[in-house]
Regions:
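Alpha-helical transmembrane segments in inner-membrane proteins
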Residues: 1-362
Length: 362
């Protein structure tokens, strides 16, 4: 009798796909998908509650009944004016900026397989801030719809410089190399922006709070002008979950599974540039939101980017609004800028990650 031949060993990509889809190509259990979808609903509910707190709390607290009256039947009173012209635009800006930074951080960490990837740590926000500073200090541009293009250019330039420096040499673009390159690039860009502002005291007075990261004094016009860029970046980024899942297996495995590797990388870079440029143009450079939130999300939902990306986009504005409200409450009648509060919250998380050595590539 002829002996049976040993089956051909499966490739790592096939094993990964089989593990993800089940033994016979079946999709993951519906129960887990339903639970994750329910978690998204919970996150959305938390965001609504935090948005209500952001509108009601501040230098002077306003009852929710007054907030509802201001929304449904404004009468021109001081409380209604503050709510409609200051707090609602500020809250909407916090939601947009938080979603943009959270999604940008998740995209960067997935694409580079670098757990330290963050728009602030990799110098992307500082590049966008330098672009805005150039627009204001040298060209006198004050329209957000105009200087946002300078923010996009600065963010793209920072991305190219950081990746070029971090990937130089035989070892390639490792997490630590990229982080060091990003920190160095961010410091150079920050120094350049500071030098420009020192040359123009009037511009410095206008931008000194913005440079620390602030949601104060947004206008409805600013939101309208920047919202299309944020919306485009959010829509594009959320569509990249499946190809990024495939790329997490490696470029060769991704190609074998039908992923257009170059196109996915380019689209991810475009999404990150749109998100970071618009967020920085609106609120200044903010640190740690894009670093801490994706890590917390992956601890809950796992590594599937189809869930990591939307969860990050919902959880990050919750953190940002919480930091903003806290900054307003602890320094009444003034406030502590949200950039300072985010750093105060995010820095301990970063230190804890480093001490536990959770810095392996994703």
């Amino acid at each position: 009798m002829r002996p049976a031949e040993d089956p051909e060993p499966a490739s790592p990509a096939a094993l990964t796909v089989e593990k993800r889809e089940g033994p016979q190509g079946k999709p993951p259990r519906r129960g887990r998908s339903a639970a994750l979808a329910g978690g998204l609903a919970v996150a959305a509910g938390l965001l609504v509650l935090m948005a209500m707190a952001s509108v009601a709390l501040g230098a002077r607290s306003v009852p929710l009944s007054v907030v509802l009256d201001a929304l449904l039947s404004p009468d021109g009173s001081s409380d209604h004016t503050v709510i409609r012209e200051l707090r609602i635009p500020r809250t909407l800006l916090g939601i947009g900026v938080g979603a943009a930074l959270g999604l940008a951080g998740a995209l960067m960490q997935s694409l580079t397989r670098n757990p330290l990837a963050d728009p602030g740590l990799l110098g992307i926000n500082e590049g966008a801030a330098l672009g805005v500073t150039l627009a204001l200090a040298l060209f006198g541009l004050t329209d957000p719809a105009v200087y946002v293009w300078f923010a996009f250019g600065g963010a793209a330039l920072a991305s190219l410089i950081v990746y070029s420096l971090g990937s130089a040499g035989r070892s390639g673009a490792g997490p630590v190399r990229l982080t060091l390159a990003g920190i160095a690039t961010g410091m150079v860009f920050t120094a350049m922006a500071s030098a420009l502002l020192r040359m123009d005291p009037q511009t410095y007075d206008r931008m000194r709070f913005w440079l620390t990261g602030s949601l104060a004094a947004p206008t409805a016009d600013t939101l309208v002008r920047l919202a299309p860029f944020m919306a485009a970046g959010l829509a594009l980024g959320l569509l990249l979950g499946r190809p990024l899942n495939m790329l997490s297996l490696g470029d060769d495995a991704g190609k074998a599974l039908g992923v257009a590797v170059t196109r996915t990388r380019v689209l991810t870079g475009v999404a990150v540039t749109l998100l970071c440029g618009a967020a920085t143009a609106a609120a200044g450079p903010l640190w740690f939101v894009g670093l801490a939130i994706p890590h917390a999300v992956r601890a809950v939902v796992g590594q599937d980017q189809r869930w990591v990306l939307p969860y990050s986009a919902l959880a990050a504005p919750v953190l940002l609004l919480a930091a903003d409200v806290t900054g307003r409450l602890i320094a009444r009648p003034g406030e502590v800028q949200v950039g300072i509060m985010c750093a105060a919250i995010g820095a301990p998380i970063f230190i804890l990650m480093a001490r536990r050595r959770r810095l392996a590539a994703l």
